[in-house]
């Protein structure tokens, strides 16, 4: 029932929105938060999600926008942050998602202070969840992205229970690889205030910059799945998952 008002708003926006999709809302430990509405002015919008302007993909893994999507700016005084305890579940909801081939990745970054003033490309990101090729082959197997679609265009993960309290940005990313050697990155960011935890922080080996974590030389980025139809292995790009 929560989706109806926002879906109605999205239906009034530009025709481009018919392609691809994006995160329209979050559920954090059972509390619902509407996201930013793209193709609309940020004036009057107040949300935990960082601004993003288009459903179009980022196709260059070194693009400056890859941390939090095209624009990716905070909403200034209208920007919110959701308070959530370490160990809580987080669900992101996409309004639509047509692609089923590719990995789903979830990152976080400690802002070291108020995230509203943070520059996301300067943060150090760590991965808390990823699902790539679950079973089968590259072209006909089950992918994380396929699981997202099957689960009503949603993805649920948990904030590491040991994570130190603080101000964080949560980043969901879909990497669509259905077009040969033309990766499509779809990142979305939201601001959190994490409470509780056990004071743990990921070691340096788990931290990356965005851009900086990916390149076209990565086998999981620059890939032609149709030339390897019987392949049953896929290497998810980026760092290993930090589980706390």
Curated annotation (Swiss-Prot):
EC number: 1.14.99.56
Disulfide-bonded cysteines: 68-189, 111-115
Organism field: Heterobasidion irregulare (strain TC 32-1)
Binding site for Cu(2+): 20, 99, 186
Signal peptide range: 1-19
CDD domains for this protein: LPMO_AA9 (cd21175)
Gene from which this protein is expressed: LPMO9B
Biotechnological and industrial applications of this entry: Lignocellulose is the most abundant polymeric composite on Earth and is a recalcitrant but promising renewable substrate for industrial biotechnology applications. Together with cellobiose dehydrogenases (CDHs) an enzymatic system capable of oxidative cellulose cleavage is formed, which increases the efficiency of cellulases and put LPMOs at focus of biofuel research.
Keywords (A to Z) from UniProt: Carbohydrate metabolism, Cellulose degradation, Copper, Disulfide bond, Glycoprotein, Metal-binding, Monooxygenase, Oxidoreductase, Polysaccharide degradation, Secreted, Signal
Cofactor(s) listed: Cu(2+)
Keyword Oxidoreductase on entry: yes
GO annotation, biological process: cellulose catabolic process
Physiological role: Lytic polysaccharide monooxygenase (LPMO) that depolymerizes crystalline and amorphous polysaccharides via the oxidation of scissile alpha- or beta-(1-4)-glycosidic bonds, yielding specifically C1 oxidation product. Catalysis by LPMOs requires the reduction of the active-site copper from Cu(II) to Cu(I) by a reducing agent and H(2)O(2) or O(2) as a cosubstrate. Displays catalytic activity on insoluble cellulose using I-beta microfibril model substrate.
One function term, GO molecular function aspect: monooxygenase activity
Glycosylated residues, chain numbering: 152, 233
Superkingdom to which the source organism belongs: Eukaryota
Catalysed reaction, written as an equation: [(1->4)-beta-D-glucosyl]n+m + reduced acceptor + O2 = 4-dehydro-beta-D-glucosyl-[(1->4)-beta-D-glucosyl]n-1 + [(1->4)-beta-D-glucosyl]m + acceptor + H2O
Residues annotated for (1,4-beta-D-glucosyl)n binding in this entry: 39, 224, 226, 229
Keyword Disulfide bond found: yes
A cellular component annotation (GO) from this entry: extracellular region
Name the UniProt record assigns to this protein: AA9 family lytic polysaccharide monooxygenase B
Binding site for O2: 178, 184
Cofactor note: Binds 1 copper ion per subunit.
Source lineage: Eukaryota, Fungi, Dikarya, Basidiomycota, Agaricomycotina
Alphabetized PANTHER family for the sequence: GLYCOSYLHYDROLASE FAMILY 61-8 PROTEIN, PUTATIVE (AFU_ORTHOLOGUE AFUA_1G12560)-RELATED
Pfam families from the UniProt entry: AA9
Family the UniProt entry places it in: Belongs to the polysaccharide monooxygenase AA9 family.
């Amino acid at each position: 029932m929560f989706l109806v008002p926002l879906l109605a708003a999205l239906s009034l926006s530009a025709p481009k929105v018919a392609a691809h999709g994006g995160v329209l809302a979050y559920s954090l430990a059972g509390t619902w938060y509407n996201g930013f509405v793209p193709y609309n002015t940020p004036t009057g919008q107040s949300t935990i999600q960082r601004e993003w302007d288009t459903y179009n993909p980022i196709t260059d893994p070194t693009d400056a926008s890859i941390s939090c999507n095209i624009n990716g700016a905070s909403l200034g005084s209208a920007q919110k942050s959701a308070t959530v305890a370490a160990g809580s579940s987080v669900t992101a909801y996409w309004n639509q998602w047509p692609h089923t081939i590719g990995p789903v990745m979830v990152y976080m970054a400690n802002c070291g202070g108020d995230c509203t003033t943070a520059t996301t490309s300067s943060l150090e990101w760590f991965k808390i969840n990823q699902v790539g090729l679950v079973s089968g082959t590259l072209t006909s197997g089950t992918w994380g992205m396929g699981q997202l679609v099957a689960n009503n265009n949603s993805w649920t993960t948990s904030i590491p229970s040991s994570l130190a309290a603080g101000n964080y940005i949560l980043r969901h990313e879909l990497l669509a690889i259905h077009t040969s050697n033309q990766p499509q990155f779809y990142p979305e960011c939201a601001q959190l205030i994490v409470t509780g935890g056990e004071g743990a922080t990921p070691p340096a080996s788990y931290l990356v910059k965005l851009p900086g974590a990916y390149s076209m030389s990565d086998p999981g980025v620059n890939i032609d799945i149709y030339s390897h139809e019987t392949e049953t292995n896929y290497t998810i790009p980026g760092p290993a998952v930090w589980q706390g």
